[in-house]
A protein has these predicted regions:
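Active-site environment of non-heme Fe oxygenases that use a 2-His-1-carboxylate facial triad
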Residues: 1-130
């Protein structure tokens, strides 16, 4: 897991143009499953009306086809590379092996999550609260 806001802050400080591009360029995410197709288009870094970071949407697996002008496409790919590079720095990550009975609660608009290799069986259940 890693805190998306922390990466956004680093990008703003170290690569301000990349941060601005990731806040400007809309990316479509898509989910298909269980008889539904959900699509949403938003920038990777979404800010509220006050300029405060409201949501980080970075998911390489749910990204739909991207159709952009050449300059925006290059800027988006540069931003994705920069974001992904920071996200994969060990000091940016928090790793924990869940045990039976453990519960993990986090803000899905701020914390990004994934999984690493493991041995054995696992069963997970997820829920969303609005």
């Amino acid at each position: 897991m890693f805190e998306g806001e922390r990466i956004a802050e680093r990008l703003a400080a170290e690569q301000p143009q990349v941060h601005a591009d990731l806040a400007r360029i809309g990316v479509t995410g898509i989910y298909k499953g269980d008889g539904v197709v959900l699509r949403a288009r938003r920038p990777i870094l979404r800010h509220d009306e006050t300029g405060r970071l409201a949501q980080v949407s970075f998911n390489n697996y749910d990204r739909d086809t991207v159709r952009l002008a050449d300059d925006d496409m290059r800027a988006l790919y540069a931003g994705i590379r920069a974001f992904d590079s920071m996200a994969n720095e060990p000091e940016m990550q928090w790793r924990y092996t869940l045990r039976p009975g453990d519960m993990l609660v986090f803000d899905n608009w701020r914390v990004l999550h994934g999984r690493g290799a493991f041995r054995g069986k696992r069963k997970m259940a997820g829920a969303y609260i609005n």
